[in-house]
Amino acid sequence: MTITTNDLTELQAIAEAGAAQLGPDATAEQLLQWTAETFGSDFIIAANMQDAVLIDVADKAIEDKNAVGGKLKALFLDTGYHFAETLGTRDAVAQVYDLDLHNVTPEHTVAEQDQLVGKNLFASDAAQCCNLRKVVPLRGALAPFRAWVTGIRRVEAPTRANAPLISFDDAF
């Protein structure tokens, strides 16, 4: 069954049902198969290059690419602060896995942002910098999709230690 609703209450219920169905110990493969079966082509994998393994797992777990629109969709959030090697890895991963890569950028370049709000906003107001360079562009990029898969790791921070396998995030 492929879900075609944009109703936030219904999407939240789908997330809760999926979490109950899969349980907290489901594998990444099981989660990705459930996501493809549930959302079809209306999901995207949001991955930075530390999460490139997620692309590999999805490529192997979702054998029928027609079920997801022919290609896996992946989102790379280019904040303007990445090393050249990171961008090279992004491009190589997209080529190796034949992805529909959505390269998402903020409204302004780093230089333009420096002109508008001052240099090194990340040092003077990290929350505002994160909002401008990550949150706002991510909201726009995720708007066409009903679901997204991320590679957050529970070991990254105490706030992620109990991150559920499937959740509903009304911020996006």
Give the ranges of each region predicted by the language model.
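ATP-dependent adenylation/nucleotidyltransferase module used to activate substrates
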Residues: 2-172
